[in-house]
A protein has these predicted regions:
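Extended charged/polar low-complexity repeat regions
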Residues: 1-500
Length: 500
């Protein structure tokens, strides 16, 4: 009687609101009254799959979410830490490393400009139960987070314990990010004005930008001295860019309705495309191109597209079942494709029938992974997956199979066929594919610049190289025979000349 459902559509999702169980204090008068508010305890989709949130009943994390069970039955443990725990951990690490402990306060200010702060942070997420792999759970967290002494997110580590993101913050303004980095990539830095607005974005291996703010106007200048001006209208969440002055002096414009939905766009040549959003849903019901030709779109009461008519008058139609699943699609040429389902709790089809009467069938795992595919000739392909959902084997007819291996970061490292022929793959720290080793031992490689753009590729002993400008555009290509091709661009990055 004290649990509630909330939804904005009969098809869901439904929000389950209730209260979390807690252990009463020793001197508390029982029965304790119910709290005056409800908290989110679960989320149910239209197929009955429930994501359940488990909250701590007692202790320093009482009322906090410390576990999640997804709709497939997997359980995840959310490891929370307090500021005091993180401070103690930092001190212990300093002692074990023989270094001087850094300043790490045991408490944080209770309130910030963003609201109340209890100092609790998410430090790791573990998979603790998997119905498909109950005896093969990961021995490490799926993701781990590091925090600064001021409670700011400092680093993100993936399941291999590799740091994949890092963040740096302003010494004076808590929570103001001044730099961030992806693993293997240069650090991008930011500068701010007194109002907390970004005035500079500094990219050491690419374009940098400056931002100048005026009333209803923002000027953006890159390190090639190209300038764009954004003209805005509206306030807060309804502020929109209504005019854009491009680096070549051309102007494009946009119009919006009273609630901020796009109504029209005018290109640099003065040609206007009009959009007609539905008053209630905001879905586009009509698009009229500059030449006056129109496309129309129609939806059901669940906001699903039921038909679309193009400027040529041809119509595409769709039908759905009571669960909102697509069951039939009629192409503009009249061809009909039907979709069939054998499980009321799944949105994945078990079969498709095309206009020729040919049928393809599929089976799926509880996690939505394709297990088998049978084509219209009756040939069956089977797929094996690991606990992370990656394909580990593909089995085709006549005993032909292909096996995939991955490293701890989830990167494909090897592909082997039934005869034992193996192709191996190597990567750099950023995750770029650097080497492909064929079954005969031959190697093909690629070298990259700081931003991950290929600067040199070698295949069969032949090398091709590329040079880029600060904007990341190819300006010189040297082919395998040593010939050169150069490229020039205009201020809008359009190719205007190719020589070679």
């Amino acid at each position: 009687p004290h649990r509630y459902l909330a939804t904005n559509s009969p098809q869901g999702p439904w929000w389950l609101l209730g209260w979390c169980e807690r252990v009463p204090e020793a001197d508390e008068v029982l029965p304790a009254p119910l709290p005056p508010y409800r908290v989110l305890t679960g989320l149910v989709d239209r197929f009955g799959r429930t994501q359940t949130f488990h909250r701590e009943a007692a202790g320093e994390f009482s009322g906090e979410i410390t576990g999640v069970t997804d709709g497939a039955g997997r359980h995840f443990r959310l490891v929370l830490t307090t500021q005091a725990q993180r401070a103690e951990e930092a001190r212990q690490q300093a002692i074990s490393g023989g270094t001087e402990p850094s300043a790490f306060p045991d408490t944080l200010p209770g309130y910030t400009e963003y609201g109340r702060d209890n100092g609790i942070r998410l430090s790791a997420v573990w998979l603790t139960h998997d119905p498909e792999y109950p005896e093969n759970l990961p021995a490490a967290p799926l993701v781990r987070y590091g925090w600064t002494p001021r409670g700011e997110l400092a680093a993100v580590y993936d399941r291999s314990n590799t740091q994949v993101r890092s963040f740096t913050y302003d010494d004076k303004y808590r929570g103001r990010m001044v730099a961030h980095r992806h693993t293997g990539r240069p650090e991008i830095r930011y500068r701010y004005d007194s109002d907390g607005r970004v005035t500079e974005q500094l990219n050491p291996a690419g374009l940098s930008y400056t931002y100048q703010y005026e009333k209803d106007r923002i000027t953006i200048t890159d390190s090639l001295n190209r300038r764009e001006v954004l003209h805005t209208q509206g306030e807060a969440g309804l502020k929109r860019v209504v005019k854009k002055e491009h680096a070549d002096g051309s102007v494009t414009q946009s119009q919006f309705d009273a609630v901020g939905r796009l109504k029209a766009q005018t290109d640099a040549a003065g040609r206007t495309t009009e959009y007609s959003p539905d008053v209630v849903t905001g879905l586009i019901t009509r698009i009229t191109t500059p030449d006056g030709r129109a496309s129309a779109f129609y939806y059901n009461h669940h906001s699903q597209l039921t038909s679309a008519t193009g400027p040529d008058g041809l119509e595409m139609r769709r039908k759905y079942d009571e669960y909102g699943r697509l069951i039939q699609e009629t192409a503009p040429d009249g061809d009909i494709t039907r979709y069939r389902y054998d499980n009321p709790h799944s949105d994945l089809p078990c079969a498709t029938d095309d206009a020729t009467g040919s049928r393809k069938t599929m089976t799926w795992s509880r996690y939505g992974q394709l297990l088998t595919f049978t084509d219209c000739s009756g040939y069956v392909t089977r797929y094996d997956h690991d606990r992370f959902g990656q394909v580990t084997a593909v089995h085709r007819e006549e005993g032909l199979s292909q096996y995939h291996a991955y490293d701890s970061r989830g990167q494909l490292t090897a592909v082997k066929d039934t005869q034992g022929h193996e192709t191996r793959y190597e990567y750099n720290a950023a995750g770029d594919l650097t080497t492909v080793i064929a079954p005969d031992g031959s190697r093909n490689g690629t070298q990259y610049d700081a931003w991950g753009k290929a600067i040199c590729t070698t295949q069969g002993g032949l090398t091709r190289s590329m040079e880029y400008d600060a904007a990341g555009r190819v300006i010189r290509l040297t082919s395998e025979n040593g010939s050169h091709t150069t490229f020039r661009y205009d201020v809008l990055d359009r190719l205007i000349q190719e020589t070679g």
